[in-house]
Amino acid sequence: METKINGEELPYVVCKLNKGESVVTENGGMSWMDDGISMKTTTNGGIMKGLGRALAGESIFMNVYTAEKDDVEIAFASSFPGQILEFDLKEGETIIAQKRAFLCAEPTVDISMHFRKRIGAGFFGGEGFIMQKFQGPGRVFLELDGAIYKRELADGQKLKVDNGYVAVMTSGVDLNIETVKGCLLYTSPSPRDPKT
């Protein structure tokens, strides 16, 4: 399968398939496709896997698109402004992503829900307790809102990030939440013009 990510504000990925190659997406994920591609709806791993995906913010059912001839194209577009990132996962390699990040993948990628180890990180973090887990082998495409800044951490290195800004991480990253000491945050109605 050949792929190309196009567009800037509202990107899309075009997958060029040869006969027998497939790509998986959730219901409503496909934008357009050539003639010569068949579609099958499945739970992609059974009803329990489907329910797990539903808890992670995705659809219970997945659509599998398979090329019936060579050199056919199918496109998947982001549903909001941001970026599409491609991850080529090796056998057993795992990434964890925010809910609703999944766009499409090769059918060999295992898609499931991921519970944060520390329950406080889930309840007080902006992305919630349940995230998505993708395990290789295969390529997966994620749609993420806004601009992306990639940061690689050394062993034992800590990085403080405002809650809700963690989009994707490897399975070896330990995500926790800290409180800011000595601060009290509150809001009240305020005028639009500071002079009034």
Question: Language-model segments: what does each one mean?
Answer:
Residues 1-22, 27-94, 156, 192:
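Conserved loop->alpha-helix
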Residues 43-52, 115-120, 177-185:
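A cross-kingdom feature marking solvent-exposed beta-strand/loop segments within repeated
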